[in-house]
Amino acid sequence: MTTESTRSTDHSTRGAYVAVGEAFDRDMNYIDDRITADGRDGWPVEAGRYRLIAARACPWANRTLISRRLLGLEDVLSVGMPGPTHDRRSWTFDLDEGGVDPVLGYERLQQAYFARFPDYPRGITVPAVVDLPTKAVVTNDFQQITLDFATEWTEHHREGAPDLYPAAQRE
């Protein structure tokens, strides 16, 4: 657990993370590991094992929150919500008590990325799914996360959950 004396309070990197006059360019190189029913990538679907980190300010993250709710995965997949702002380093849990995610014990999502990849060179994006035993990011591939909720987490879908990715409609 972090204490006030060990937490970073340097907010000097707050502010815009895009250059004035330039469009936001989302990092599209994702951590593409998958959480699957059979665990073929080393990450099996297990109730209570993972935490979805999704900021409401991010449209890519909102689709995972919507899918989770529609499918009834609330009891098997917890959610951490960073605040609506992002500094140059990472999304922060500034809205949580003490500025720390209550489950992970992290003040920045970046810590989950570095727990798995100490020299992670890319953008720290949401949504991200974090493995709770290791507190390390598993994936941040927003498109695949949503598809996997629909196709790999079916054992945990609520009764009457919609089929969000019908086999007949797949390419």
What residue ranges belong to the model's regions?
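GST-like domain detector, emphasizing the conserved glutathione-binding G-site
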Residues: 2-171
